[in-house]
Amino acid sequence: MEKVPMTLRGEQMLRTELERLLKLRPQISEAIAEARELGDLKENAEYHAAREEQGICEAQIRDIEYKLSVAQVIDVTKMENTGKVIFGSTVTLIDVDTDEEKTYQIVGDDEADIKAGRISVSSPIARGLIGKMEGDEVAIQTPGGAKDFEIDRVEYI
């Protein structure tokens, strides 16, 4: 089984969601029991809704448990900063053409949130940055075409 990289923050988010779902599980079972008491199950909307909710909840629990079982949690704060872009590092880029500064943290696929500055390790930008060093100039293929960036800072935060 291949390990999937995940930040400490990503692991904590998954564990919090798993805890929430595990607390929800008995409530759904109660709703099913109450709906059963209402009689005929063929035309019992409450029963069918609760069963559907149970199926969704169980699927989410299995999904999170699987993700946690294959996760390789990487805590970059415990690593020596060598200036090299690695999984979990926070990279500040300067657009060579516009001098615009952008900062991204390279995270696992499930943790990515571009609005929060977290990009997936498998995104074109991250793939173009991994292994490069602070001060390097890189050409990255973006949806708008190739762009040149300078790696201004690499932080392990």
UniProtKB/Swiss-Prot annotation:
Gene Ontology molecular function terms on file: DNA binding; RNA polymerase binding
One Pfam family per UniProt: GreA_GreB
Membrane-spanning ranges: none
InterPro entries per UniProt: GreA/GreB_C_sf, TF_GreA/GreB_CS, Tscrpt_elong_fac_GreA, Tscrpt_elong_fac_GreA/B, Tscrpt_elong_fac_GreA/B_C, Tscrpt_elong_fac_GreA/B_fam, Tscrpt_elong_fac_GreA/B_N, Tscrpt_elong_fac_GreA/B_N_sf
Keywords: Coiled coil, DNA-binding, Transcription, Transcription regulation
Job description of the protein: Necessary for efficient RNA polymerase transcription elongation past template-encoded arresting sites. The arresting sites in DNA have the property of trapping a certain fraction of elongating RNA polymerases that pass through, resulting in locked ternary complexes. Cleavage of the nascent transcript by cleavage factors such as GreA or GreB allows the resumption of elongation from the new 3'terminus. GreA releases sequences of 2 to 3 nucleotides.
Identification of the protein by name: Transcription elongation factor GreA
High-level lineage: Bacteria, Pseudomonadati, Pseudomonadota, Gammaproteobacteria, Vibrionales
